[in-house]
Structures are given as structure tokens and as C-alpha cells.
């Protein structure tokens, strides 16, 4: 039983609570009632704890911060059992969550982040995991001392110290404690003097929690998202260099996969730790797009396993990123026919990669002698590094990972733009020891030797902000509730963004909506999405005339931008012009097109609250967004492009169509929306039939396997086989009957 030591003193307004609350029901689904609040106020917290009364009780302090100043404080004292660390940890965890939940419910607020003292984390090791998964709070850990310390210290103090090649850079020296004469303190009996017989100034628990709250706020940037952190020589210091603790409990990762995959991961990670193998990833951008998402999740997981891994990005160059995006579009065959890779662009590209590469090959850099032992290079932005690495460290194995479609039918057409770009890139890529492609037919030019070719799908993280289950309290914070224009109330993150851009709004939860989450890219088939929706609305009018149009679902097209994607604004403008032209403008008020800020939870809420998910790409890589939708139980209607057919079981978890079959897409819309039994059947199947291979843990095993084999000095010759099959065999964990995996259909990789 907890003993109140100090209760929260602020009182919530009943009038405001009544004004903000609402219950929404749907005419089509009258038994479903959703109670929401029009707005939740963003807040931050600081949490500290310490043992008291001869270690028989534990005091917990929570400070509430509104982003400007600390506004409230509470503390409780709970009994603990000396020696029973498991029970004590669970009791402390429950009290912290209860205090924060109680304040949230009474004051209609949403805690975005919480500063946690290192002393509290030691007593309650899984507290951060529970804050993240159960309450959608970003926990940031600080070594807040119980004594006052000198503020004049070297910056970038961290409580975690790792190797210079790891993802966590070393911290500075410890902040020195401030000592004073013993006579200046009231009761010095519990304090230990220093060599000069001076005593430290105690810092009370409320001061510690307040300090944690203020420090936490410093790690949030625009749109209240955690700041991206890049270190010296451009390592991406994932999770603020280890201060952000999303998942401390490895058991959470284990529960996302089957026993075979997990056992394989542990065996491979153990060998790499024992050998102290250092792994380095190199890609073009730290944020935006699927590669960056995968790398953040991968580094987070491998660091939790104590594998020495780091991820590096170059200094950005808008000029070069325009060139790399052009190259991407040319290789996929979606660029203008007259677009060419000029010699001037090649020279600028080469100079840019050389400048960045020299920083990494210089003494102390990750590619210098003594640096990483295995190099993984992502996509056609970075292959210029390969000859430089081979020159400086010829013994280091290099793996090139291609995430995009390379039109095999075009790259070998003499004098074509595709041949020109591919020859330029292949000149460097051919020096790599391994070429990894998505498992999709005709994705690899015939120049690539089959013995060097390996297959690996893309991945997503089931525990990050993009995919974790959002609590019913948190989801409306991102979605908001529909309010008439002119309302002065904060209407939730997404609605506020729509209002800011004067975009039509979703009338959720009163109305369903269909969603396509994708970058604004010429290959994503967005015009086909708009046309299919138009045809679907006409079907509802003719086949279901009794259904009021206010009950027809809306359409949401949304996605993040990427640092290296200059096309997004151009495509966005084209889509808006299309929506407002004949014949589509009739339904323009029900079509919402939004470029969203880099908030994973925002995209999560958009997908989780939708009725149906789309992916009508005309050209595609793997597109793991499909598996993300299936994982939430959303049936997916998609095109047979790239790796999409590997993820959808046609007629069971969704429908596959040929690009441009808009009437077929509209028909599937109609079936899903009017046949509840069909929808539920497919939804349940989708939720339970997603392969381990597309999750972070299964994907990580593939990278661990390659690092292990190269560390043994073995030469890998996959001959076009799946890396997942190799690591399961190597670790003695074969696939079991009935285990869900991506189909191993015969592929014609090189056309």
C-alpha cells in the first residue's frame, strides 16, 4: 500500500472537461460508441526514486512540466522487501505508471516524454519499457546525482560509455560534486566528508525529479519529436546516444518472433560479442524513408544485445541528392525519357563521396585501420565508398545492399539512360564481396555474378512508434476529433496539421477512411489511388443507394518526406491538381492529402484507425508498409509489383491487382466495405500471418549471420539464395512445419 507523501496540487476544470469530451457513433455501426476528447495537452515528466527508512520503503517523486516550467509535483512512499528485487521492481513500476495515468486522466494531458533517474532505473529495470509500450512516453535516462554538482563541465555527459566505434560515443568526465563546510549544513550526520573534511550539499528527491524533467525537455525538437542526434564524423547516435530507453526488456523482442528465429539471433550475437567484431553500416540519410527506419530499429536492437555496431551517414548535399534521386527514378524507369546522368553530376557525386569517405578513412575513423571489421553499404547513393575502402583496407569484407528495383530490361539497352546510370554505379559496386537484393524477379542486372547474389526482404519494427499498439487514450491525441472549422480548440496533432494547411479533414471516428501511406513519389501510383476511390464512391451510389453519403468512407493519402527526396513537393502538387479537376473534384471534400512531419506515432495512428489499406505502387522495392498494415489487421489492396506479392496472400489477407486495374480495386473496396463477415475474416487472417522475416529481429539475424561468417574468414557464395535460410541452417534452427515465412517461389532475379 502506498503512503501519500505529497499529492498533485493542481485541479482540473470540470467545465473544460465537459466541453472537450464527446461521444461519437456511426449510423452504419450504431452499437459502436467512441468517447474522445477534442484535445490533450502535451506534457513532460521527471521521475526519481530512492530507498528510505533502512531500505524498507521506497520513495517515488514525479514532477510535471508543461514545456515552459514545472507545474506540479507528487510523491509516494511504498513498502519494499529487502532482497526481493523482482517484486520491488514491479511495485515501483506500477506506482509510477499509476501516478502518471491519474494525472493524465484528471488533467486531460498526454505525456510525451519522461526523464528517469539512473538510480530509479537500477531499482526498476523495465520501467522505461513499460512507459514506452503502455503509455507511449519516450523515456530518457539521466544520471541525476543525490548531491549538487558543479555546472561548469564538459558538455555531452552521458551515463553510458561504449567503444569509439559503437553507436554510443564516450561521455565526458563525471560532473564534480560541490562541497561546503560542515558547519553550513543543518544535519550532516548522514553525509560523508571528502578529503578536506567538507560535505556535499544534498539534492532532495523533488529536485532530482525536477532536474530530470527539465533535461528531458531538451531532447525534444520541432513538432515535439525527439531530436535526431549525429556525432563527430557523422555516426547516427541512435536514441540520443543511448539516453532514450525504448526497449530495455529483451523479452519484448523475443515475443515478436518464433523460437527458431530467436535462438538463431542469440547464438550469432554471442559469437560476435565473444570475438569483439565491429560492424559498420553506411547509408545516405538518418531520417525519412524505409532504410533509415530499418537502421534505427536495427541499431537499437543490436545494441540491446551488446553487439558492437555503428551507423554512419554523409554530410547532406542538396545538389548530390537531386542527382541520386534522378538516378533512382531512372533505374526504376519512372523518370522523364530525356533525363540523363551528366558528367558534371558524376563529378559532383564523386567529389562528395570522396570528401565524406576521407573523414572515415582518416586515423581514428570507422574505415581506418582498427575500425570496423565488416562494412554494409546501402543503396546507390554510397557505392563510391567501395573503391576507397578497398584501397585503404583491402582485407575488409564489403556487402552492398540494394533496396530498389533496377530495371533489368532497360539497363542493358545500349545508350539508354538506365544503362548509363547502371554502368556508372556498377563500376564501384562490382568491387563489393556480396550483392544483396530484395527477393523479386528481374531486380538484378545480369552483370552481377550469381555467386555473389543473396536475397533479403525489407523489415519493420513491431515495437517502435510506427507499429506498437497505441492505447485508446493516446491514439486520439494524434488523430484528433472532428470539429467544425472556426473552432478555437486544439483538435489533435493530425487535425491541427490539416487546419494549418487548409486541408479537408477526416471525420473520424464517425466515418471510416481508406489509407495509402507512402512517400510522394512518381512510382507510388497515387493517381490510380484517386481514380479507384472515385470509382468506388460511384459504386456505393449505384449499388447501395440507401446508404447516406455521410456514411461513405473518406480517402487519406499521407506519408513522410526524406532528406534525400526532392521530388515530394512536385508530386504533391500534381496530386492536388488532380483531386481538384474533373471528375474527381466531386469528392474532393472527402480526399485528404497530407505530407506529415517525422512522427512515427502519427503514421501509426493513421494506419491503425483506418478501415482498409492500399499500396497501388506501379514500381516498387519490397514495401514493408504492406506487412505493417497486415500486422494491424488491415486487409490490403495492392498491386503485383516488387515484393508486395510476397507479403499478401491473395483472397486471404487482401487482394492483389495489376497496376492500372482501377475498376478491380474499386470492386474490392466495395466488397470490404459492405460485407462485414468478409472483412473480419480477412482482418483476422492478416493479423496472424505476418512472417518473422519482416520484423527487426528476423532481419537482424541476417546481418549477424553475414558478420559471423566473414569474421570466421569464410568466403560467402550464396548463388541467389535467401540469407534467412542460411542463418537458420547454420545455427541448427530449421524452419518448422506451419511456420509463417515469405514464399520461396522460383525467382528469375536477372531476367
Curated annotation (Swiss-Prot):
CDD domains cross-referenced by the UniProt entry: GT4_trehalose_phosphorylase
Noted pH dependence of activity: Optimum pH for phosphorolysis of trehalose is 6.7. Stable between pH 6.0 and 7.0.
Keyword check for Glycosyltransferase: yes
Disordered: annotated segments: 1-28
Coiled-coil segments: none
Induction remarks: By heat stress, cold stress and salt stress.
Keyword vocabulary terms for this entry: Carbohydrate metabolism, Glucose metabolism, Glycosyltransferase, Transferase
Temperature dependence: Optimum temperature for phosphorolysis of trehalose is 36 degrees Celsius. Stable below 30 degrees Celsius, activity decreases to 58% of maximum after 3 minutes incubation at 40 degrees Celsius.
Catalytic activity: alpha,alpha-trehalose + phosphate = alpha-D-glucose + alpha-D-glucose 1-phosphate
GO molecular function annotations of the record: alpha,alpha-trehalose phosphorylase (configuration-retaining) activity
Quaternary structure, from the entry: Homodimer.
Role according to the record: Reversibly catalyzes the synthesis and degradation of trehalose from glucose and alpha-D-glucose 1-phosphate. The equilibrium lies in the direction of trehalose synthesis.
Protein name: Trehalose phosphorylase
Organism: Pleurotus sajor-caju (Oyster mushroom)
Gene behind the chain: TP
Amino acid at each position: 500500500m502506498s503512503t501519500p507523501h505529497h499529492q498533485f496540487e493542481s485541479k482540473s476544470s470540470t467545465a473544460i472537461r465537459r466541453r472537450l469530451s464527446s461521444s461519437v457513433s456511426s449510423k452504419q455501426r450504431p452499437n459502436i460508441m467512441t468517447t474522445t476528447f477534442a484535445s490533450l495537452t502535451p506534457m513532460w515528466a521527471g521521475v526519481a526514486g530512492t530507498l528510505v527508512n533502512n531500505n524498507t520503503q521506497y520513495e517515488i517523486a514525479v514532477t510535471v512540466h508543461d514545456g515552459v516550467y514545472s507545474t506540479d509535483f507528487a510523491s509516494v512512499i511504498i513498502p519494499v522487501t529487502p532482497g526481493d528485487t523482482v517484486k520491488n521492481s514491479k511495485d515501483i513500476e506500477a506506482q509510477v505508471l499509476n501516478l502518471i495515468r491519474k494525472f493524465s486522466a484528471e488533467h486531460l494531458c498526454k505525456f510525451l516524454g519522461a526523464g528517469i533517474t539512473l538510480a530509479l532505473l537500477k531499482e526498476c529495470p523495465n520501467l522505461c519499457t513499460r512507459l514506452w509500450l503502455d503509455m507511449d512516453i519516450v523515456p530518457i535516462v539521466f544520471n541525476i546525482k543525490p548531491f549538487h554538482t558543479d555546472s561548469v563541465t564538459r558538455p555531452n555527459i552521458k551515463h553510458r560509455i561504449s567503444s569509439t566505434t559503437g553507436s554510443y560515443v564516450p561521455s565526458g568526465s563525471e560532473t564534480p560534486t560541490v562541497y561546503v563546510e560542515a558547519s553550513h549544513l543543518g544535519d550532516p550526520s548522514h553525509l560523508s566528508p571528502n578529503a578536506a573534511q567538507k560535505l556535499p550539499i544534498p539534492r532532495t528527491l523533488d529536485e532530482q525529479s525536477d532536474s530530470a524533467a527539465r533535461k528531458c525537455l531538451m531532447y525534444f525538437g520541432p513538432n515535439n519529436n525527439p531530436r535526431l542526434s549525429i556525432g563527430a564524423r557523422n555516426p547516427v547516435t541512435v536514441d540520443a546516444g543511448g539516453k532514450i530507453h525504448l526497449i530495455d526488456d529483451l523479452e519484448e523482442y523475443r515475443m515478436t518472433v518464433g523460437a527458431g528465429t530467436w535462438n538463431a539471433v542469440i547464438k550469432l550475437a554471442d559469437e560476435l560479442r565473444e570475438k569483439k567484431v565491429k560492424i559498420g553500416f553506411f547509408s545516405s540519410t538518418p531520417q525519412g524513408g524505409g532504410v533509415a527506419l530499418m537502421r534505427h530499429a536495427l541499431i537499437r536492437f543490436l545494441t540491446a544485445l551488446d553487439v558492437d555496431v555503428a551507423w554512419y551517414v554523409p554530410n547532406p548535399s542538396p545538389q548530390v541528392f537531386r542527382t541520386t534521386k534522378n538516378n533512382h527514378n531512372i533505374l526504376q524507369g519512372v523518370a522523364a525519357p530525356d533525363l540523363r546522368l551528366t558528367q558534371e553530376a558524376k563529378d559532383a557525386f564523386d567529389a562528395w563521396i570522396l570528401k565524406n569517405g576521407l573523414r572515415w578513412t582518416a586515423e581514428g575513423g570507422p574505415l581506418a585501420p582498427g575500425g570496423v571489421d565488416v562494412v554494409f553499404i546501402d543503396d546507390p547513393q554510397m557505392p563510391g565508398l567501395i573503391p576507397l575502402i578497398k584501397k585503404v583496407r583491402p582485407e575488409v569484407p564489403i556487402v552492398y545492399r540494394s533496396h530498389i528495383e533496377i530495371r533489368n530490361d532497360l539497363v542493358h539497352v545500349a545508350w539508354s539512360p538506365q544503362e548509363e546510370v547502371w554502368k556508372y554505379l556498377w563500376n564501384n559496386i562490382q568491387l563489393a564481396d556480396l550483392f544483396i537484393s530484395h527477393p523479386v524477379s528481374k531486380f538484378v542486372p545480369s552483370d552481377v555474378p550469381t555467386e555473389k547474389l543473396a536475397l533479403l526482404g525489407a523489415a519493420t519494427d513491431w515495437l517502435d512508434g510506427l507499429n506498437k499498439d497505441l492505447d485508446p487514450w493516446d491514439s486520439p491525441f494524434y488523430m484528433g476529433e472532428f470539429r467544425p472549422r472556426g473552432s478555437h480548440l486544439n483538435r489533435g496533432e493530425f487535425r491541427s496539421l490539416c487546419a494549418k494547411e487548409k486541408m479537408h479533414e477526416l471525420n473520424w471516428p464517425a466515418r471510416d477512411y481508406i489509407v495509402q501511406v507512402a512517400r510522394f513519389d512518381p512510382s507510388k501510383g497515387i493517381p490510380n489511388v484517386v481514380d479507384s476511390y472515385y470509382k468506388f464512391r460511384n459504386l456505393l451510389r449505384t449499388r447501395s443507394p440507401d446508404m447516406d453519403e455521410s456514411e461513405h468512407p473518406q480517402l487519406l493519402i499521407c506519408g513522410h518526406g526524406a532528406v534525400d527526396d526532392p521530388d515530394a513537393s512536385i508530386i504533391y502538387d500534381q496530386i492536388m491538381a488532380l483531386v481538384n479537376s474533373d471528375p474527381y473534384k466531386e469528392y474532393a471534400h472527402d480526399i485528404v492529402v497530407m505530407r506529415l512531419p517525422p512522427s512515427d506515432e502519427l503514421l501509426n495512428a493513421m494506419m491503425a484507425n483506418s478501415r482498409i489499406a492500399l499500396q497501388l505502387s506501379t514500381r516498387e522495392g519490397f514495401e514493408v508498409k504492406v506487412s505493417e498494415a497486415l500486422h494491424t489487421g488491415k486487409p490490403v489492396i495492392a498491386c503485383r509489383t516488387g515484393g508486395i506479392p510476397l507479403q499478401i496472400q491473395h483472397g486471404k489477407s487482401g487482394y492483389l491487382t495489376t497496376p492500372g486495374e482501377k475498376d478491380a480495386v474499386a470492386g474490392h473496396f466495395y466488397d470490404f466495405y459492405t460485407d462485414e463477415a468478409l472483412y473480419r475474416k480477412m482482418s483476422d487472417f492478416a493479423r496472424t500471418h505476418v512472417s518473422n522475416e519482416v520484423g527487426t529481429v528476423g532481419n537482424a539475424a541476417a546481418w549477424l549471420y553475414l558478420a559471423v561468417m566473414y569474421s570466421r574468414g569464410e568466403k560467402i557464395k550464396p548463388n541467389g539464395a535467401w540469407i534467412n535460410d542460411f542463418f537458420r541452417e547454420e545455427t541448427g534452427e530449421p524452419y518448422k512445419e506451419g511456420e509463417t515465412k515469405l514464399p520461396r517461389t522460383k525467382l528469375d532475379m536477372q531476367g
